[in-house]
Regions:
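Active-site-adjacent substrate-recognition loops and nearby beta-strands
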Residues: 3, 146-166, 170-187
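Residues that line or immediately flank small-molecule/substrate-binding pockets and catalytic motifs
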Residues: 39, 82, 121, 170-173
Length: 192
């Protein structure tokens, strides 16, 4: 993926704060040794071991010393109830504000000084709160990247890449071809 060329040019993520809104991150994973990861989750999450897989692997792709795209960046992790994790008892319950909701987490990330917000999800949730949170990020110069999804289908209406200001990302395999599981669509800006 030409990481050696990027690093030779000094592109390591130094001075960049990335907000990752995803499942829990197992910071004790060997590949994350030495990475600058801060858990900024607004509520606790009781996790099952398998619930950490996606968040941990996404964090490693970003900041792992050996193969991360930006190993010198600071990663702020905002945990969701993705996977088999469940929200802790300090969550504000139904009828109130769910602090684990994506609009709230996006706003937390902006307030915490994120330069980039990465969303590893696709969703048909087009709520006003989510639209306003993304619009606020874009208006403040925060770059938002979002997965095209893993449904192996044209997902024009279920990923955020087609929203103005959001960089849609599909997946490629080691040969640079679209990964068999990756979704695609008009909102895809790049592939990684």
């Amino acid at each position: 993926y030409h990481l050696d060329q990027a690093r030779a040019k000094g592109y390591t993520g130094q001075g960049v704060t990335i907000a990752m809104i995803d499942g829990p991150v197992e910071t004790s994973a060997p590949e994350l040794s030495g990475a600058a990861i801060i858990d900024n989750s607004p509520c606790s999450i009781e996790k099952a071991p398998e619930a950490t897989a996606h968040g941990t692997s996404t964090a490693a792709l970003l900041v792992a010393r050996d193969y991360g795209v930006v190993p010198d960046a600071t990663l702020h992790a905002y945990r969701t109830d993705a996977g088999d994790a469940t929200l802790g008892s300090d969550r504000i319950g139904s009828g109130g504000v769910n602090l684990a909701g994506y609009p709230s987490l996006i706003n937390h990330a902006i307030n915490d000084g994120a330069h980039i917000i990465t969303l590893s999800l696709s969703s048909s949730d087009h709520s006003d709160a989510l639209r306003w949170a993304i619009a606020r990020a874009v208006s403040q110069g925060v770059l938002i990247t979002a997965s095209a999804g893993n449904e192996a289908q044209d997902s024009n209406d279920s990923h955020f890449g087609w929203w103005s200001g959001v960089v849609g990302v599909s997946a490629v395999d080691t040969n640079g071809a679209r990964a068999s599981y990756s979704s695609w669509g008009q909102g895809v800006t790049t592939a990684a």
